[in-house]
A protein has these predicted regions:
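Single conserved hydrophobic/aromatic residue that forms the stacking wall/gate
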Residues: 1-11
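Electropositive, gly/pro-rich neighborhoods at or near active sites that engage anionic ligands
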Residues: 10-187, 300
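Residues at the starts of beta-strands that form the adenosine-phosphate
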Residues: 167-168, 191, 244
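C-terminal functional extensions of proteins
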Residues: 230-301
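Glycine-rich beta-strand-to-loop/alpha-helix junction loops that act as flexible
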Residues: 226-228
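Structural motif
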Residues: 168, 221-222
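A mid-sequence, solvent-exposed acidic-amphipathic segment
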Residues: 176-220
């Protein structure tokens, strides 16, 4: 709407000086190896690998920095993130944002964002990275709003749908996330169940969430996590226990934006979209029978 467009324009104007400053920073970009998105999905589908994703926020926390966010900082939280990132479990794929190294497919605003991240955060990323490791692209679950080509977005969404094709799925999500409600994203899954977790500070319930999964989820079931940085940790720790956990992040929001031909990170009725700048959402899906019947546990208090 008009208000969101105005907010977006103001944000881009505010970003411009930081971007111009970032252009002057000559970053030494290391040679980091990446799986293609096709290779990542193939490994998840054929070899049942898990995926843990890390962005600039996770690297800030790992570096000991707190920030205004939906997740409070603690030393234990940072330690668990770092352990997940450095995991040597061969069944765990670790994702980092490919845009930091190559943003050629991105739109102008995303290119500005990644250039700023490269200038300000690359040194922090590098100290955690293993140049001998092959990483996945953490942005594989965000194939729309930052990209110029809708055909590319359509291709990646079709690719992602292979992950849960004909699989029994348990979604571990925040209580306002409601993955798949209002769209057909998961229609090709055999079944969808949910474990509902806190929308904010989910890490405080980490052990309770793991206990719920152990109690309610069979190990041949695919777990999809949409729980911020807590999902990054869960992917690693549950992979160590023999589960397949894919940190799927913002995929549902990105898909809704794609269906709407959105040009901004706009609100979506009935879903909490933290990037829209709006902290509330309607209860449009709260009494939906398909949503209610899919819930197998709530880990909230």
């Amino acid at each position: 709407d008009r208000r969101q467009r105005q907010m977006c324009i103001r944000d881009r104007i505010r970003t411009a000086p930081e971007y111009l400053k970032a252009l002057k920073v000559k970053s030494q970009i290391p040679e980091i190896k990446f799986y293609s998105d096709e290779e990542t999905v193939s490994l998840i589908v054929k070899e049942r690998k898990s995926l843990s994703r890390f962005g600039d926020g996770e690297f800030m926390w790992m570096s000991g920095e707190s920030m205004v966010s939906f997740q409070d900082y603690s030393a234990e939280f940072a330690s668990d993130l770092t352990s997940a990132f450095k995991s040597d479990n061969e069944n765990l794929l670790v994702g980092i944002p490919h845009g930091v190294f190559d943003s050629s497919k991105c739109n102008l605003y995303a290119k500005m964002h990644w250039r700023i991240i490269r200038a300000n955060f690359l040194s922090r990323l590098v100290k955690f990275m293993d140049v001998n490791r092959v990483y996945s692209d953490a942005s594989i679950t965000r194939p729309y709003i930052d990209y110029r080509d809708r055909n590319y977005s359509a291709k990646i969404f079709d690719l992602l749908k292979r992950i849960w094709d004909k699989r029994d799925v348990v979604i571990v999500e925040g209580e306002k996330t409601k993955l798949g409600m209002g769209n057909d994203l998961f229609d090709n899954a055999t079944s969808i169940k949910r474990i509902i977790c806190p929308a904010e500070n989910a890490y405080s319930k980490l052990e309770a969430i793991k206990s719920s999964i152990r109690l309610n989820v069979e190990k041949d079931t695919l777990i999809l996590g949409a729980l911020g940085p807590t999902a990054s940790i869960l992917a690693s720790q549950l992979c160590d226990e023999g589960y397949q956990f894919v940190d799927i992040g913002h995929v549902d929001v990105e898909y809704m934006w794609y269906l709407r031909h959105a040009i901004l990170r706009e609100t979506i009725e009935g879903k909490y979209v933290n990037e829209s700048g709006v902290k509330t959402c309607s209860d449009v899906y709260d009494n939906d029978s398909s949503y209610i019947n899919s819930i197998i546990d709530r880990v909230l208090s």
